[in-house]
Amino acid sequence: MFVAKNLSPERESKRQKKEPEIMEPSFPLLSPNNCGHWYIRYGFCIVCKSTVDKTIEGRVFDGLHLSSEALALTKRLITKFSCLNMKKLHLVLDLDLTLIHSVRVPCLSEAEKYLIEEAGSTTREDLWKMKVRGDPISITIEHLVKLRPFLCEFLKEANEMFTMYVYTKGTRPYAEAILKLIDPKKLYFGHRVITRNESPHTKTLDMVLADERGVVIVDDTRKAWPNNKSNLVLIGRYNYFRSQSRVLKPHSEEKTDESENNGGLANVLKLLKGIHHKFFKVEEEVESQDVRLTMSVVENFSSEPKAKRRKIEPTINESSSSLSSSSSCGHWYICHGICIGCKSTVKKSQGRAFDYIFDGLQLSHEAVALTKCFTTKLSCLNEKKLHLVLDLDHTLLHTVMVPSLSQAEKYLIEEAGSATRDDLWKIKAVGDPMEFLTKLRPFLRDFLKEANEFFTMYVYTKGSRVYAKQVLELIDPKKLYFGDRVITKTESPHMKTLDFVLAEERGVVIVDDTRNVWPDHKSNLVDISKYSYFRLKGQDSMPYSEEKTDESESEGGLANVLKLLKEVHQRFFRVEEELESKDVRSLLQEIDFELNVESVE
């Protein structure tokens, strides 16, 4: 049983367990007659609720059918979010002969059979046995799988720059068995796995939810990508075991292997870093960048030394959203007042501004609801992540103006930013004479690192954007945790609301020290004790700063909240088949109810 005391200082001693009221999104502007049926789930349009012909053009993603228009706009929006929020491109990786080499055990040569004993032993972390269901499924096939040298380092480093997909011509059971070896926690690929079950013929980026201008492919076979060669980085084929036509001895029989430092994956990683650097070199030009052009001017971008490539000007297909006319378009996605779909001018009153994501973005009310739905679905299924909204002041840190320090606190001015203090900093805005001291709450860095494994995180503060930016340069300088998901009083000057968070409320947890700033979302809220390090106005007791003490690292507010967040996450994802019916609000009430019962007992 999970136990965490005093997580919510405002919790009532007895509380009835009740289900939160869940508001279904409504779309009053559209009827079956004027709806484009962009988002269809199991044969029903999500927007107008009518039955839709299954033959409508588009793509299916685990029961969710996107029309051609919806697919084009979703790809464009995901790429914008990825580039501007996370500074990530998309990377599509082949499996066989690119990341690994597998062979059926009966096909091993006599000279290779020693590997059967070595597979999975303490001496070999790169060689594994696996059993895969065959066709028919009553047949089980045993394979040996050899990981390509440098694979673990490659995935770890590439993950910092790219959202990654696996795309294989193998079966889904085979791909899942491989991924249990190379990505058991689904940190790198989530559920972004495309197999011959979904794509039985040639490979295509139509299956990848991102604009082609932001997608790089790494594959050992050029002809598998007839329509996307300009996105392709060829990698030298990795053959570890003996193949039927091979004359020379393979690595397996020679007991050697490809070079770790100068092999295929190491060379491709250097290239990917160059592409990423060039793409994001000028932040103002990111929206006009195209990896296909970037790749064509990066020297030696093929890892095959004999490959020669001419500079390719990619053919960029206009989105099929151009089929929409201004009269039939719902104006769902707007940029600087211009509808992305029909290119007509749209009034600001027709949607909500999301400038914090990227300047000029406006979404209609229908687009907000559907984007939230789609984001939550992708986050839950692909990454096994929920969304977490964090307050700054008195939750993650405490900031005070330097002139407000008491006499007994002034020693801190010298300590701030020194080698002895990595939790205390001076901050000062450009052009502002006022100087501040910011004290990070104990356990903050560990909290962010661990929470990032389970949640996509936002900062939501009543401070200014300038202030938030300065604080985030201290706690997240590389934008690993929050990206640009930062909401301030500039966007939300009154009460705080989840309307600005692009995720369904059923998958969002809020951590804040002030309950009354969330009038409409208390059921999503985890109260955290207020962190006050410096002396407050009117405070009688001595603060931590004057006592030269601090909140407990292991038993303080953030440590306790992290335990609760892990419990919520564990319960949410406990049964994968029930994900779409799970709701963090019910889980928070359930946990709180259990804690109340325990405290009474």
From Swiss-Prot:
One of its GO terms (biological process) is response to salt. Expressed in roots, seedlings, hypocotyls, cotyledons, leaves, siliques and flowers. The keyword Repeat does not apply. Disruption phenotype: Weak abscisic acid (ABA) hyposensitivity during the early stages of seedling development. Slighty decreased drought stress tolerance. One of its GO terms (cellular component) is nucleus. Pfam families: NIF (PF03031). The keyword Hydrolase applies. It comes from the Eukaryota. Its main location: nucleus. GO terms for molecular function: RNA polymerase II CTD heptapeptide repeat phosphatase activity. Residues 84-259, 381-553 form the FCP1 homology domain. Mediates the dephosphorylation of 'Ser-2' of the heptad repeats YSPTSPS in the C-terminal domain of the largest RNA polymerase II subunit (RPB1). This promotes the activity of RNA polymerase II. Positively regulates abscisic acid (ABA) and drought responses, including the regulation of specific genes expression. This is RNA polymerase II C-terminal domain phosphatase-like 5. It comes from Arabidopsis thaliana. The gene is CPL5.
